[in-house]
Swiss-Prot record:
Record's subunit section: Microtubule inner protein component of sperm flagellar doublet microtubules. Binds PARK7. Part of a ternary complex containing PARK7, EFCAB6/DJBP and AR.
GO biological process: one example: flagellated sperm motility
Name listed for the protein in its UniProt record: EF-hand calcium-binding domain-containing protein 6
Function field: Negatively regulates the androgen receptor by recruiting histone deacetylase complex, and protein DJ-1 antagonizes this inhibition by abrogation of this complex. Microtubule inner protein (MIP) part of the dynein-decorated doublet microtubules (DMTs) in cilia axoneme, which is required for motile cilia beating.
A Pfam family this chain is assigned to: EF-hand_11
Coiled-coil region list: none
Location relative to the cell: Nucleus; Cytoplasm, Cytoskeleton, Flagellum axoneme
Modified residues (Phosphothreonine): 29, 439, 449
Region (Interaction with AR), start-end ranges: 552-646
Length: 646
């Protein structure tokens, strides 16, 4: 919770729920959000208590479990309406600061003894000593510190640790520096940067004001470098990083305290221009008024940014539809076989296949491309990025793009690494291997299941090539499959792709390996792969006046939005589901041990993977959105199958 009421109970407002959904990439239309909020705030108070919120989620409130941890108290992002709580916050921060200063003074006094003890204990002359031994030495020298206190002190001095060991020379140097800093004349001390680690809470805002006033130009330059479109806004995380660069040893706790004092701790974007122009006249008594005058909201999308996204979308579409032609053009330019082409050669390819670009448009596009140190385009990386299922978007779109996306497909290279590293698992209790050709070899349920993959475009291209050689391919797979498990290693599959000249990229191979790693053991299920390419399943033919229907809403307890992405996904997977819905239903039931007709999202995803259903993560999200409207994390598998059998 972000606020407390007069009785000290945590409360949540409409914006808090919206921020939470935004943070977890759960997209809701305004109408959907109003329905959700109405179901929580049944009395129309404009807020609900933390206990009421947990009760709506079916969770019993326990003060011991659901209160903020004491050690994370200052990181708890929120402001407090009770003065007593604010005083406690300031008192705790001041105490931790005083402890750090006292520990530093002790170390300075015992510097010679500590130095001799370290030299004596370092018999191998590596200059490194473990944390435990360091604590013991400090205790013997009269400077007893807990591991937490020692760690905080090391972090404040910038002394790093390696394998739980410290370079004691760095430690001694840091102690010496702190000693010399305290002994400097007053005139020189004023020229040194302010050490924020030693400040108490009341001084933080005033000292930051001094830094901002003395470094206006440098701060403006730093913020401008982040705000390339000159919108006046930067992310709060970027804003904090700039402040920490200028405010020597400003801690996270102090930064969050500073934001709360300025009443901008709940703002995802901060207007840095307003901050620099008006922070010198900030007074704590008028903080609310000062914060209200600051422009709100995320930076508006500039026409240039929109144009860049449009060009990237066109480029993605061109590469997807003319992959081989564009690849051939790149290879024709690459006469030295370096897997790179020049800037002008890339521009010529874009002009022929995408659109004729102005100098400004091409400069912005070139900045998004994978370029080597010599300024040449690495076209294999380019093809890998722009031929994937996801449309490529510039990284600058950031949080808003993530919120609109809802659920994105993880990077394929990361997905394949996680898939290949998963250990073998035993069969889930109550589940049995299915003998039907469409099923997987076993019904394993593993936490962290690899992402779903829509390999339909890849498999469609492969069908023509495999039709003439599938028997020989199957024979070689069986020869490599000595244990007769129905799968081979990923490297063996890649070797066969080369041998049979299947003409698919490494990226596409990795997608197939993820999809057909049906046992989550890093192996490639070749039987299911060959069957999918040889057994050509077509959708049921229907007249022009007919189309696939989703079951009526009154037959379902709760149904969600019927989006175009939802329909296109169901239409594509319909032939596969119709072909093997009976064994699939048996597998669903084996996971549904209680016989409720419902499966968890994780189990539902696992079964779809076992039957090699061509769905991307985004399409899977749309299906969940329809069949789990109440966000119960349970799917009615009978409702799902019924959609394909009417």
């Amino acid at each position: 919770f972000l606020e407390t009421d007069n009785e000290g109970n945590g409360i949540l407002r409409r914006r808090d729920i919206k921020n939470a959904l935004y943070g977890f990439d759960i997209p809701l239309t305004p109408r959907e959000f109003e329905k959700l909020w109405a179901s929580y705030d049944t009395e129309g108070k404009g807020h609900i208590t933390y206990q009421e919120f947990l009760q709506k989620l079916g969770v019993n409130y326990s003060p011991a479990v659901h209160r903020p941890c004491a050690e994370d108290y200052f990181n708890f992002m929120g402001h407090f309406t009770k003065p007593q709580q604010l005083q406690e916050e300031m008192k705790e921060l001041q105490q931790s600061t005083e402890k750090a200063v006292a520990a530093r003074d002790k170390l300075v006094d015992c510097y010679q003894d500590i130095s001799k003890a370290f030299t004596k204990i370092d018999k191998s002359k590596t200059n490194y000593i473990s944390i435990c031994k360091m604590q013991k030495v400090l205790e013997e020298c009269g400077c007893s510190l807990t591991e937490g206190e020692l760690t905080n002190l090391l972090n404040s001095w910038g002394v790093s640790r390696h394998d739980n060991s410290i370079n004691y020379l760095d430690f001694l140097r840091a102690v010496e520096n702190s000693k010399s800093t305290g002994a400097q004349p007053k005139e020189k001390e004023e020229s040194m940067p302010i050490n924020f680690a030693t400040l108490n809470p009341q001084e933080v805002v005033r000292k930051i004001q001094e830094v901002v006033e003395s470094s206006q130009l440098a701060l403006s330059t730093a913020f401008s470098a982040l705000d390339k479109e000159d919108t006046g806004f930067v992310k709060s995380t970027e804003f904090g990083q700039v402040l920490k660069d200028f405010c020597h040893k400003l801690t996270d706790n102090q930064y969050h305290y500073f934001l709360r004092k300025l009443r901008i701790h709940l703002t995802p974007y901060i207007n840095w221009k307003y901050f620099l122009q008006n922070f010198s006249c900030f007074l704590e008594e008028t903080a609310e008024e000062w914060a209200e005058k600051m422009p709100k909201g995320p930076p508006p999308t500039s026409p240039k940014a929109m144009a860049s996204r449009d060009i990237l979308a066109r480029l993605h579409k061109a590469v997807t539809s003319h992959y081989h032609a564009i690849t051939q053009e790149f290879e024709n330019f690459d006469t030295m076989k370096t897997n790179t082409i020049s800037r002008e050669e890339f521009r010529a390819v874009c002009n022929r296949n995408v659109q004729i670009l102005t100098d400004e448009q091409f400069d912005r596009l070139w900045n998004e491309m994978p370029v080597n140190a010599k300024g040449r385009l690495k076209y294999p990386d380019f093809l890998s990025r722009f031929s994937s299922e996801r449309a490529a978007t510039p990284t600058a779109t950031g949080d808003s793009a993530a919120a609109q996306r809802g659920s994105s497909v993880p990077d394929v290279s990361e997905g394949i690494r996680s898939a290949l590293s998963l250990p073998n698992q035993e069969l889930r209790p109550g589940s049995k291997p299915q003998s039907h050709p469409c099923t997987a070899a076993s019904t394993t349920a593993i936490p962290g299941t690899p992402p779903l993959q829509n390999c339909d475009p890849i498999e469609s291209r492969l069908r023509k090539r495999i039709q003439g050689c599938w028997r020989q391919l199957l024979k070689e797979c069986k020869e490599k499959d000595v244990a007769r498990q129905g799968d081979i290693s990923a490297s063996e599959f890649l070797a066969l792709v080369e041998k049979f000249n299947l003409d698919i990229s490494k990226e596409e191979c990795q997608q197939l390996i993820i999809k057909y790693d049906l046992k989550n053991n890093g192996k490639f299920a070749y039987c299911d792969f060959i069957q999918s390419c040889v057994l050509l399943l077509k959708a049921k033919e229907s007249s022009l006046m007919q189309r696939m229907k989703i079951q009526n809403a009154h037959k379902m307890k709760d149904s969600g939005a019927e989006t175009s992405s939802f329909y296109s996904a169901l239409l594509r997977i319909q032939p596969k589901i119709v072909h093997c819905w009976r064994p699939m239903r048996r597998t669903f039931k084996s996971y549904d041990e209680a016989g409720t007709g419902l499966l968890s999202v994780a189990d539902f995803r696992t079964v779809l993977r076992q039957y090699s259903i061509n769905l991307s993560e985004e399409e899977f999200f749309h299906i969940l959105e329809y069949y789990d409207k109440t966000l119960s994390s349970n799917i009615s598998y009978n409702d799902f199958l019924r959609a394909f059998l009417q």
